[in-house]
């Protein structure tokens, strides 16, 4: 392919440039996207499957090369390897943006790789990666139903900003990443400072204008240079197979839906599927195992949809706006700093809050440098929560994504470090799951913070909304269960306070939803959120007045930055001695702010005394209770402050004559001395005699 390029101007100094034909020419699709000096390369490749499967094997991997910012990794291994949490989250953003664009029953193994090759420290690469991955797929042979593009939207000084720079984003009240087609939204994810539903909708509408502009340009490029799509990789489901399977299960599944019981429904569904397979599968015909199973899933979905559409009743008997029963128990665990057992229907979280000093902060490294998060939430989803056997080990992409969403939802209500100097860790242990476990993590996590005595600004609750889009009729569901998530068209999670929204995430399975549907979903989510917040505040209306007696005590000190080296000492020797002698943990930052944490006040006071001794300045005329460090024939050397020593001459030891210094004081004795003077060399002249007057 010859070199081809086009550009899309979004705003002043924000022009997207797409290039292909120069790099990775053996890839099925390869595109380099540039904005200023941030360049992101994306490739798309597909392989035929050795056997047909009932899911889409689609994999996205995003990687930020440290060399793109003129750096190398600070770790022992300098080669990029295991993806960071940030890279996993952006990989998920790209995946969730593109997955709805593929045809049903596409039998190809698809891989998209995105690399940040140049980073200018201003232009953020994630929206470029979404657009580049979409463009690479668009010009490849991989079939797609629609063209996709993505942008970031910020709210800076009351104005909407497309693809805000890093500095603009730092000042923004909103961080929204969204993707869609020229006419509809496919994916949104963001967090904000208590924006209203109307403001969130306005932000989405603002971003959609730029998405449409980019989509139109990519589509024109595809028509001009794109490869012919391999439509043979898309399997049709014969209509007669669907009809036969639907008729086979209709009566029995309809009866199962009337049970209003999850376990009974799952058992009947399992037995029905086994019966369908045993009676209808005929290999080497249209009634293959793959076709029959696909038809069975469609039939189940259609009957569930019909129940909601025609009767307004869901599979568990709830109305479309009804929320499952909620139970809450705070201080659930006796020795933790804060805990909550939060149960909503058959979804349950044991949330735990742990408080600590600066050393407990979560360290990270990315293209912008090193950092430490003083608040983080970690989500755990063991296989027993859904009654299964599975792998236990490092977290998967789903766990990382769910944890980060809940973390963002709660981060906006945390107090400033100057008011509450603790590092805060929340863990959400999912012990039961039937939909909306990430939002249970928000609710349980919030209550665990309050139980731990963290002075949050306001309680936060979360709810997941679903959608049944059938025969041009859109039905929004509140607090969706697992089967509604699996068979429905949308999963729209919204978290916030009574004042406004703090975090949101939407994934859909159809080609896009309209502004009106999102408006209805957000309005319904607000009602549900208020209901949950009311139940939460009935149990705990405000945070505990003080932290748990099992939590460490933390105090801060401010020293002059010129004294930092003195406190740390050569090779960290001095600060290690302070920690050993006091039993407290001592952390100091580049601004001279010292955090001292310990289990007892005595340890904190001791550490403060040692630090004040190191950083304090000696004063002429002041009396010190010093320590004799050595005895010589002409006097005694006395340490008045840590590292500050002076001579008390033999003539200054007593009002009476002293013949032998060793008869008067010994090394290690405490001796009150007065600082008489400091000479031009900085030497201290001390007197014990002067303290006797």
From Swiss-Prot:
Annotated SMART domains: KH, S1
Catalysed reactions, as listed in the record: RNA(n+1) + phosphate = RNA(n) + a ribonucleoside 5'-diphosphate
Top-level division of the source organism's lineage: Bacteria
Enzyme Commission numbers on file: 2.7.7.8
UniProt: Mg(2+) binding residues: 485, 491
Cofactor(s), by name: Mg(2+)
Enzyme class: transferase
GO molecular function annotations of the record: 3'-5'-RNA exonuclease activity; magnesium ion binding; polyribonucleotide nucleotidyltransferase activity; RNA binding
Paired cysteines (S-S): none
Gene Ontology BP terms: mRNA catabolic process; RNA processing
Protein name stated in the entry: Polyribonucleotide nucleotidyltransferase
The species this protein was found in: Chlamydia muridarum (strain MoPn / Nigg)
The organism's taxonomic lineage, starting at the top: Bacteria, Pseudomonadati, Chlamydiota, Chlamydiia, Chlamydiales
Gene: pnp
